[in-house]
């Protein structure tokens, strides 16, 4: 499975998260996953909440349309974006 794949109702992203980064950004490929750096620390779900907010802003969707399907407690996550209004260039280059 690739880092970015399309499904009937949106996109599925396989992510590697780097918490406590200096700024929020989509870094690029990290093995077979998409690396995303976020400023939030990995404490009490802060990183997941921040990741959801950041991805919602990048894809121009509501936070409720960003679903963490797998990896709630780890750095390796699978996230589904429902009906994205915008696809960042880093992600568009990786779509199948």
Curated annotation (Swiss-Prot):
Using the record for this protein, list the coiled-coil segments as residue ranges, or answer none: none
Q: What's any one GO cellular component for it?
A: cytoplasm
Q: Which domain of life is it from?
A: Bacteria
Pfam families associated with the record: DUF167
Q: Which HAMAP family match?
A: UPF0235
Question: Which protein family is named in the record?
Answer: Belongs to the UPF0235 family.
Q: Which PANTHER family match?
A: UPF0235 PROTEIN C15ORF40
Q: What is this protein called?
A: UPF0235 protein Ent638_3359
| The organism of origin for this protein | Enterobacter sp. (strain 638)
């Amino acid at each position: 499975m690739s880092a970015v794949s399309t499904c009937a109702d949106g996109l599925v992203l396989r992510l590697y998260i780097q918490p406590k980064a200096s700024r929020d950004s989509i870094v690029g490929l990290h093995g077979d996953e998409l690396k995303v750096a976020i400023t939030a620390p990995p404490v009490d779900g802060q990183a997941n909440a921040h990741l959801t907010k950041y991805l919602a802003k990048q894809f121009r969707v509501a936070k409720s349309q960003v679903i963490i399907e797998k990896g709630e407690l780890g750095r390796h996550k699978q996230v589904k974006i429902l009906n994205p209004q915008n696809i960042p260039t880093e992600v568009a280059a990786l779509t199948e």
